[in-house]
From Swiss-Prot:
Mg(2+) 1 binds at residues 74, 117, 119. This is 3'(2'),5'-bisphosphate nucleotidase 1. The lineage of its organism: Eukaryota, Metazoa, Chordata, Craniata, Vertebrata. The modification N-acetylalanine is found at residue 2. The modification N6-succinyllysine is found at residue 244. Inhibited by Li(+) and Ca(2+), but not by Na(+). Mg(2+) 2 binds at residues 117, 120, 247. InterPro entries: CysQ/Inositol_MonoPase, Inositol_monoP_metal-BS, Inositol_monophosphatase-like, Inositol_monophosphatase_CS. It comes from Rattus norvegicus.
Amino acid sequence: MASSHNVLMRLVASAYSIAQKAGTIVRCVIAEGDLGIVQKTSATDLQTKADRMVQMSICSSLSRKFPKLTIIGEEDLPPGEVDQELIEDGQSEEILKQPCPSQYSAIKEEDLVVWVDPVDGTKEYTEGLLDNVTVLIGIAYEGKAIAGIINQPYYNYQAGPDAVLGRTIWGVLGLGAFGFQLKEAPAGKHIITTTRSHSNKLVTDCIAAMNPDNVLRVGGAGNKIIQLIEGKASAYVFASPGCKKWDTCAPEVILHAVGGKLTDIHGNPLQYDKEVKHMNSAGVLAALRNYEYYASRVPESVKSALIP
């Protein structure tokens, strides 16, 4: 039995393998051809068979190994028996070799909260925009996001039949972020990435105030943060309620681990303790570099309309 002082790295190592399994499930559901789409609250708020299966897989796999965790998932699923084939009990040996940052070495299992988005970018998943899709597992301690795993099931899917499909990015504050090549957006350019399907006047007003050279409208919070760390966008601007804690927890860690910053529109850090409301009601503002420029451009009219 591994010692309890190493609980964070054991959890990250397990979540890495679980996220890879989740990516396989996402691809299998597409390959089978029946997405099992259910409309939740609106035509843009969808749930698929993949959402349901992946959440069952992640939550059941984690809770078997770490029974004292608090796990909060996007999908509201009825309790029931979980198919044994959905359980992943492996762990990344490479991650286990990494040192646990000293500030987290004494963490207890019951102090951790895990935020799960089984399929981030579900609408895009149903429309075949597969590169927008991610699986998100975020880990929080004392209300702060400290570790995150992002699986991209369809990374490389347009690179030809010989390409390796999918990748898993992971990070821990104080250790770093891994599984991708860090790249900054072109200097002097303001390339904004924002929502594809949930725009409104607040969002467009806020983006206009940034003097953008280009605006990218894509699905998925995880996908947008990946655009920041790979130099495809300079800032992620979403001046609206809509995205939830499970959308931002894992991506925030990856961004923060490489020196970026993610806050609400007012510049407040997001809170991830288990009692917190799920909605990021004051929106999201994030950048890898030059965060202060984007924060300084947010109009007062936008700030006053978004109450934290």
